């Protein structure tokens, strides 16, 4: 028999009760997490979002409530009234927040039963993730996911409070916008009223937040959903959330200072971690030189060492020919890894090949010196010079790649991260921030045979480099900056172009005709002609930030209703087909598959 809630009101959450509540009458509501029948007394662990309380059903005290407890099973929904009591001596559970008390039931309502669960909620390590996503409403009852999402809510509240205190105004920008596909593909929304025309869901509020600066709002922020129709991986979703900010009459230093304060507030209050300010900075060129990537993980060493000048005249033609042909040779010293087996080194070689390396040379440092197939090609002086460059000691393993600069940096940069994970060097409880600055403004796209924006087309060049935008584009640096945490880019921003003629020049450099630029971005170009202030901003990926704060392996563990890597919601069965009438109203006819 199912009971109605009636006029019952909850007095406490299950996780709130402590020794100080002993003797109080309470009303609790929640789910049966566990039920134990001791041949008379029935013990139920009653769970809600705040925690668990042990509930005791005694047939002598309340036979009616005891009968309901006998029929209850896991995930049944109960409401109980009772008295908080101290647990008997020897039964206190110090691992539980409520472990010193129990509630002696005087009344019970069985509000709803539950079917048998497709998986248990107290440890689902071996449960297929697709099953968890199909039954997401059950998955979300687990403590870890609930804690993740409640912490996410706290981070959002901290963000709003901090930015509001610093003069930012929270404003919404449109979700139905114009398609300007310059990067990832847009999600398109057909217009019923304007048949044959489409809105696009925004990949970011970029243009609208710049226009808000033109409009004089000075400081804007928004915690906003964005959409990209792209191939997915563990830290990507088709819909994602950004902490989006823009400021007027500022330079890079102003933005960095304010945003460092935001990160310090979030990590102190949400994670109990002090962020040392100011955050370390590194130019793009330094990051590539030392770590091979522009998002370096600074929790460990394994820095790259440039060896080109040492080996360019050596007897090892593989290295010498690469350097003399315009390539480079770099290596890294994997400290204490000299005992690594040949198979393990072969596995590292195959990993490096994924990123374009043709091979991976190695040297094991022994008491006798170099142990390596390439040792015979180098003079003692060359070996000594390389040993010094590597700070090589007995027991170390030296790894080398020779190729074009991009291949060398990509392969060794990724190999560095791979080795750190393999060797346990990435402590999830250590948080190392670094700002990466002075990015290139443009990069040459070999496939398209044109220049492409490294960040986006609205990023301003350095003042001193503006003169080279047409004559020497590869020389230009951008007023761009990324915030990297433990090897993950968590935020990216720039000072924007605020002059129409410079923005038009940038579009021209990206291969857009004047007509095409006007068609796609005419409203921005028009706005820039009406007294646009210098401005800039940044956007933080909230999903990725929460993944790092919580130590999760995937952003799917910090999003309430994520999609799969194929962009599907297994719970609601989206995306799905629509009926013919809806398509006719939109003027759409589907092509045959």
Swiss-Prot record:
Q: Could you say which protein family the record assigns here?
A: Belongs to the class-II aminoacyl-tRNA synthetase family. Type 1 subfamily.
- Entry keyword annotation includes ATP-binding: yes
**Keyword Glycoprotein attributed:** no
Q: Which gene encodes it?
A: aspS
Q: Where is this site: Important for tRNA non-discrimination?
A: 38, 90
InterPro entries membership: Aa-tRNA-synt_II, aa-tRNA-synth_II, aa-tRNA-synth_II/BPL/LPL, Asp-tRNA-ligase_1, Asp-tRNA-ligase_1_N, Asp/Asn-tRNA-synth_IIb, AspRS_core, GAD-like_sf
| Biological processes per GO annotation | aspartyl-tRNA aminoacylation
What name is this protein filed under?
A: Aspartate--tRNA(Asp/Asn) ligase
CDD domains for the chain: AspRS_core, EcAspRS_like_N
The entry's cellular-component GO terms read: cytoplasm
User: Which PROSITE patterns does its entry note?
Assistant: AA_TRNA_LIGASE_II
Q: What does this protein do?
A: Aspartyl-tRNA synthetase with relaxed tRNA specificity since it is able to aspartylate not only its cognate tRNA(Asp) but also tRNA(Asn). Reaction proceeds in two steps: L-aspartate is first activated by ATP to form Asp-AMP and then transferred to the acceptor end of tRNA(Asp/Asn).
Q: Which E.C. number(s) belong to this protein? A: 6.1.1.23
The UniProt catalytic activity note for this protein reads: tRNA(Asx) + L-aspartate + ATP = L-aspartyl-tRNA(Asx) + AMP + diphosphate
- List keywords of the entry alphabetically: Aminoacyl-tRNA synthetase, ATP-binding, Cytoplasm, Ligase, Nucleotide-binding, Protein biosynthesis
Q: How does it assemble?
A: Homodimer.
Localization per record: Cytoplasm
């Amino acid at each position: 028999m199912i009971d109605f809630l009636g006029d019952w009101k909850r007095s406490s959450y299950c996780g709130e009760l402590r020794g100080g509540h002993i003797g109080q009458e309470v009303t609790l509501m929640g789910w049966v997490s566990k039920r134990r029948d001791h041949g008379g007394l029935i013990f139920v662990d009653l769970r809600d979002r705040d925690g668990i309380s042990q509930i005791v059903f005694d047939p002598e005290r309340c036979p009616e409530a005891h009968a309901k407890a006998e029929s209850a099973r896991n995930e049944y929904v109960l409401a109980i009234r009772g008295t908080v009591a101290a647990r008997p001596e020897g039964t206190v559970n110090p691992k539980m927040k409520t472990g010193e008390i129990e509630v002696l039931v005087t009344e019970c309502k069985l509000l709803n039963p539950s079917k048998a669960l497709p998986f248990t909620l107290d440890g689902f390590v071996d449960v297929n993730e697709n099953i968890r996503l199909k039954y997401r409403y059950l998955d979300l009852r687990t403590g870890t996911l609930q804690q993740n999402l409640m912490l996410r809510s706290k981070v959002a509240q901290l963000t709003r409070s901090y930015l509001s205190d610093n003069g930012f105004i929270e404003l919404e920008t449109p979700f139905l916008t114009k398609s300007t596909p310059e990067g990832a593909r847009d999600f398109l929304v057909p217009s019923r009223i304007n048949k044959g025309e489409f809105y696009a869901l925004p990949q970011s509020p970029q243009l609208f937040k710049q226009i808000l600066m033109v409009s004089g709002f000075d400081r804007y922020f928004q915690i906003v959903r964005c959409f990209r129709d792209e191939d997915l991986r563990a830290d990507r979703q088709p819909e994602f959330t950004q902490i989006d900010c823009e400021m007027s009459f500022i330079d890079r230093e102003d933005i960095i200072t304010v945003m460092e304060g935001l990160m310090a507030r979030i990590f102190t209050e949400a994670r109990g971690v002090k962020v040392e300010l100011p955050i370390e900075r590194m130019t793009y060129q330094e990051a590539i030189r030392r770590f091979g990537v522009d998002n370096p993980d600074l929790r460990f060493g394994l820095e790259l060492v440039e060896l080109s000048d040492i080996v360019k005249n050596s007897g090892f033609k593989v290295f010498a020919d690469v350097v003399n042909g315009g390539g480079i040779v770099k290596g890294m010293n994997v400290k204490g890894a000299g005992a690594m087996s040949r198979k393990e080194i072969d596995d590292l070689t195959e990993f490096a090949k994924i990123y374009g390396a043709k091979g991976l040379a190695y040297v094991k440092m022994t008491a006798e010196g170099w142990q390596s197939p390439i040792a015979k090609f180098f003079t003692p002086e060359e070996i000594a010079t390389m040993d010094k460059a590597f700070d090589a000691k007995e027991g170390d393993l030296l790894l080398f790649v020779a190729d074009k600069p991009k291949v060398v940096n990509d392969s060794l940069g990724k190999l560095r991260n791979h080795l750190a994970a393999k060797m346990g060097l990435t402590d999830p409880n250590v948080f190392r921030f670094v700002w990466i600055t002075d990015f290139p403004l443009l990069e040459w796209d070999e496939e398209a045979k044109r220049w492409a924006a490294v960040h986006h087309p609205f990023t301003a060049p350095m003042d001193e480099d503006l003169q080279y935008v047409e004559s020497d584009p590869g020389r230009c640096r951008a007023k761009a900056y990324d915030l990297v945490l433990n090897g993950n880019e968590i935020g990216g921003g720039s000072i924007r172009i605020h002059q129409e003629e410079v923005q038009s020049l940038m579009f021209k450099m990206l291969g857009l005709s004047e007509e095409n630029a006007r068609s796609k971005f005419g409203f921005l170009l028009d706005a820039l002609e009406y007294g646009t202030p210098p401005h800039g901003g940044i956007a933080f990926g909230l999903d990725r930030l929460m993944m790092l704060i919580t130590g999760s392996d995937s952003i799917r563990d910090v999003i309430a209703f994520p999609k799969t890597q194929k962009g599907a919601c297994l719970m609601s069965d989206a995306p799905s087909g629509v009926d013919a009438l809806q398509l006719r109203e939109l003027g759409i006819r589907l092509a045959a598959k």
